[in-house]
């Protein structure tokens, strides 16, 4: 089952579930994210659904090619009530997104995020937020494939 030409570099992640622990997670307060990647809209899109700590927070992303802007674009909707719109590029096994945030209560207006597509099939994500006019470190997570993990919402 094929993806559109512009999404093909992400083909190996389709149909897989990944689980990752946040870099700032502790044994007393573990924080982990589960995400599931799937083919959508007859292969013209990828849908990524994720949840943190079984639904404390979560969201859904759609990634597609936009011929008008000649770029991958995405939309991300969250359980916290905000959403992002992004342009994305794939370079050197990295998916890099530049996101505009709407409706965030913490003063975050932009996000720069990178997903490293590691040669062993794992993922590494890192983000930065433009919060109250300053760039600050966001989250960092290393994911491993976890076929039995489930994305859960409350």
Language-model segments: what does each one mean?
Residues 1-154:
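Hydrophobic small-molecule pocket/channel-lining residues, especially in calycin-type beta-barrels
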């Amino acid at each position: 089952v094929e993806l559109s030409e512009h999404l093909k570099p992400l083909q190996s992640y389709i149909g897989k579930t990944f689980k990752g622990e946040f870099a700032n997670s502790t044994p007393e307060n573990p924080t982990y994210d589960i995400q599931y990647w799937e083919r959508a809209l007859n292969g013209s899109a990828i849908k990524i659904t994720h949840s943190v700590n079984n639904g404390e927070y979560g969201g859904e992303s759609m990634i597609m090619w936009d011929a008008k802007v000649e770029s991958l674009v995405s939309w991300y909707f969250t359980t916290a009530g905000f959403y992002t719109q992004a342009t994305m590029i794939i370079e050197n096994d990295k998916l890099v997104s530049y996101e505009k945030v709407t409706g965030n209560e913490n003063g975050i207006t932009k996000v720069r995020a990178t997903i490293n597509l590691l040669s062993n099939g794992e993922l590494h994500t890192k983000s930065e937020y433009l919060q109250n006019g300053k760039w600050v470190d966001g989250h960092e997570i290393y994911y491993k494939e976890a076929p039995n993990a489930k994305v859960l919402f409350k």
